[in-house]
Amino acid sequence: MVKRYAVILAAGQGTRMKSKQYKVLHPVCGKPMVQHVVDQVLQLGIEKLITVVGFGAEQVKAQLGDQSEYAFQQEQLGTAHAVMQAAPYLQEKDGVTLVVCGDTPLITAETMQALLDHHLATNAKATILTAVADNPAGYGRIVRDAHGNVEKIVEHKDASEQERAIKEINTGTYCFDNKSLFEALTHVSNNNAQGEYYLTDVIEILKSNGSIISAYKAPSFEETIGVNDRVALAEAEKIMRERICRKHMMNGVTIIDPAHTYISAEVRIGRDTVIYPGTVIEGKTVIGEDCTIGPNSEIKDCWIGNGTTIRHSVAHDSEIGNDVTIGPFAHIRPSSKIDDEVRIGNFVEVKKSTFGKGSKASHLSYIGDAEVGVNVNLGCGSITVNYDGKNKHITKIEDGAFIGCNANLIAPVTVGKGAYVAAGSTITDDVPENALSIARARQVNKENYVDRLSIKKNS
């Protein structure tokens, strides 16, 4: 098998993005653009991957880690100059090299594999990934000879009227015979208006040497889109989102309105789960089977079991079990663990807390830094008072306890197994097992008191 290498061009500053963030690190469906490219390239059996970095190099390295080796482009002097930075790693090697831009997040492993196969089948020294564009203005045109081989690439500004009518364009992705690539790079000149070294000149050099230059058409233009500004970023996000939703639907997930459902690239969802509109599912969230999510819910980096319902709610960085009901308008904050058959109702906030199986907080409660046992009932308005102005403290509510409405549990405190806390109580001391704790003033009724007031209501 021919050895395969890849060079990803990720050194451009991306000034048109008008952003402090390095261009290729802008996310598309929750994943940086360059990570999308790397994930696809690594599916091709690549022996060595070189990412060319420049501005923002350390951020790119932090993102990709040991998935790639790195070449540094001190000055951005053109695409050929960028590829040349990979010479110390690759120039003496036999095989083929893919050159891919780090700002093309929609390119797929399938298309790059087809490009490789076509390159080898045609015995070419260079193969260009092309695409057919409805509006090719601004792109270099692919001019082919009678045999279908590439005769030349003509930039839009230099093209004749006949050449401008060509809709097949250069996408900036290539496959080269590796040694031929690096030999040709030594002959590239910057004798042009921009004073830069262009990778397209390699095509002309190889062609002039009598080498075969081939081209492979991508199945769609959208797959080759380069993201250079926020408009293109939004377009890439839209296309990627459609792909992701389609993949989940083909795997047995019902998405009521894909156009208004936002699922990140690394999310996993089980079959027969239903996703309603306005739902955002991000990070590395895993959702089981037979769940109902949404409408208008936000879930990030959660693990969710089977048969769970989350409506009009937010959940982050938490574990939620089977047959749980959350919402509407609940907030599950990070580091919470909700066991099976728990009910977290409307306007309940849970933060860094555990709920045992079958427990309920049905409405209007704050449960923070708490350990809630099995089959606990937290009445309306229950509050774990966890903060003393300096430190957070833990509340423990053991199995089978019953917390009445509008009860304040002042942490650190423990409510024992089967204990009851009367409605309206403020609990500052531990409650023993099976005890009833009442911590409120006794009701006093003053007969005819209103008649003795100096100021009476007007009738």
Swiss-Prot record:
Pfam families noted in UniProt = Hexapep (PF00132), NTP_transferase (PF00483)
Q: What class of enzyme is it?
A: transferase
Which pathway is this protein engaged in?
Answer: Nucleotide-sugar biosynthesis; UDP-N-acetyl-alpha-D-glucosamine biosynthesis; N-acetyl-alpha-D-glucosamine 1-phosphate from alpha-D-glucosamine 6-phosphate (route II): step 2/2; Nucleotide-sugar biosynthesis; UDP-N-acetyl-alpha-D-glucosamine biosynthesis; UDP-N-acetyl-alpha-D-glucosamine from N-acetyl-alpha-D-glucosamine 1-phosphate: step 1/1; Bacterial outer membrane biogenesis; LPS lipid A biosynthesis
Catalytic residue list: H363
* Gene Ontology biological process terms, A to Z: cell morphogenesis; cell wall organization; lipid A biosynthetic process; peptidoglycan biosynthetic process; regulation of cell shape; UDP-N-acetylglucosamine biosynthetic process
Per its UniProt record, the required cofactor names are: Mg(2+)
The record's annotation in InterPro entries points to: Bifunctional_GlmU, GlmU-like, GlmU_C_LbH, Hexapep, Hexapep_transf_CS, NTP_transferase_dom, Nucleotide-diphossugar_trans, Trimer_LpxA-like_sf
Q: Where is the stretch described as Linker?
A: 231-251
Residues that bind UDP-N-acetyl-alpha-D-glucosamine: 9-12, 23, 73, 78-79, 140, 155, 170, 228, 333, 351, 366, 377
| Stretches for region N-acetyltransferase | 252-459
Q: What is its main location?
A: cytoplasm
Q: How does it assemble?
A: Homotrimer.
* Role played: Catalyzes the last two sequential reactions in the de novo biosynthetic pathway for UDP-N-acetylglucosamine (UDP-GlcNAc). The C-terminal domain catalyzes the transfer of acetyl group from acetyl coenzyme A to glucosamine-1-phosphate (GlcN-1-P) to produce N-acetylglucosamine-1-phosphate (GlcNAc-1-P), which is converted into UDP-GlcNAc by the transfer of uridine 5-monophosphate (from uridine 5-triphosphate), a reaction catalyzed by the N-terminal domain.
Q: Report what the protein is called.
A: Bifunctional protein GlmU
Species of the source: Geobacillus sp. (strain WCH70)
Q: What is the lineage of its organism?
A: Bacteria, Bacillati, Bacillota, Bacilli, Bacillales
